[in-house]
UniProtKB/Swiss-Prot annotation:
It holds the Pfam family PEP_mutase. Keywords: Decarboxylase, Lyase, Magnesium, Metal-binding. This is Oxaloacetate decarboxylase 2. Belongs to the isocitrate lyase/PEP mutase superfamily. Oxaloacetate decarboxylase family. InterPro entries: ICL/PEPM (IPR039556), Oxaloacetate_deCOase_bac (IPR023687), Pyrv/PenolPyrv_kinase-like_dom (IPR015813), Pyrv_kinase-like_dom_sf (IPR040442). Its cofactor is Mg(2+). It catalyses: oxaloacetate + H(+) = pyruvate + CO2. GO terms for molecular function: magnesium ion binding; methylisocitrate lyase activity; oxaloacetate decarboxylase activity.
């Protein structure tokens, strides 16, 4: 097997973005899984931040993972990969200056592209979930990311959640991110092709979708025609690994009784109930200080 350099893989990813076909990204989490993805014919892969949080912390995806922890995880994947890796840069781990550091570190880790989202993370005191930062600040992060990359082949992908704001706001946001120089726009929460058309008619850059297997957005020909070049259908491989690990350990231990479903496993072993209680206690103004 001839190894390709990180720069070469970034060029390959850029060619995917500029091509005319939609590709489904493999959700990978370690060297073996990315080698499997390559062997099975995937052209691109992603190391999800939520998956890294499960791996490293055994915690829900609530912005507990640090930049160093994520970089260490994605570096392992990057060293073994023969296909481009998309890194999940979350919110850039802070403001625009933090974004610059994030880009530098993820570039060294070998990612071919990174997504940078406009969600306010972590949640502030007494703040509802899924709050978006001002689009001017988000656009400044895109400018900063472009400034910080030393390899122009590294793709900067601006990500936004269209399900938590209005159509007009989503259009204004993506237009601003395109103007700021994003190489692609990543959309979360698109309902169907009609919604997709309304959201992207003004865009010239390629589209990436995170749709978690939405059947209304499964037609590859229509996705390709809509300028969608990358689709992420969730992170089933690692979730399946969690389920398989539990079942193997359960069999080895000889434990009897009812088997836990995957949602039950995730809730129990990521301490979800505890984190919810801690959030109610420490992130809400109504908590009792006595």
């Amino acid at each position: 097997m001839i190894e390709r350099s990180h720069h070469d893989l970034r060029k390959v990813f850029g060619e995917l973005l500029q091509g005319d076909t939609c590709k489904f990204a493999a959700s990978v989490f370690d060297p073996i899984s990315v080698r499997m993805a390559y062997d099975l014919g995937f052209d691109v892969a992603i190391q999800g931040g939520s998956v890294a949080s499960l791996q490293v912390l055994g915690a829900p995806d609530i912005a507990l993972l640090t930049l160093d922890e994520y970089v260490e995880q994605v570096s392992r994947v990057g060293r073994a990969s023969q296909i481009p890796i998309i890194g999940d840069a979350d919110h850039g781990f802070g403001n625009a200056l933090n974004v610059m550091r994030t880009v530098t570190e993820l570039q060294k880790a070998g990612v071919a592209a990174l997504t940078l989202e406009d969600t306010h993370l972590p949640a502030k005191y007494d703040e509802q979930s899924h709050v978006l930062i001002e689009r001017e600040e988000a656009a400044a992060k895109i400018y900063a990311a472009r400034f910080a990359r030393s390899d122009d082949a590294l793709s900067i992908i601006a990500r936004t959640n269209v399900a938590v704001t209005t159509l007009d706001d989503s259009i204004a946001r993506t237009a601003a991110y395109q103007k700021a120089g994003a190489d692609a726009i990543c959309l979360v929460g698109v309902k169907d092709f009609q919604h997709l058309e309304a959201l992207t008619a003004h865009l010239r850059v390629p589209i990436m979708l995170i749709n978690y297997g939405n059947p209304a957005l499964s037609n590859v020909e229509k996705l390709s025609a809509a300028n969608v070049r990358i689709v992420v259908n969730g992170h089933a491989p690692y979730l399946s690994a969690i389920k398989a690990t539990y079942e193997a350990l359960r069999e080895q231990s000889g434990t009897e009784g009812s088997e836990l479903s995957l949602p039950e496993l995730l809730s129990k072993y990521t301490l979800s109930d505890s984190y919810r209680e801690w959030a109610k206690t420490f992130l809400k103004s109504e908590h009792d200080s006595n």
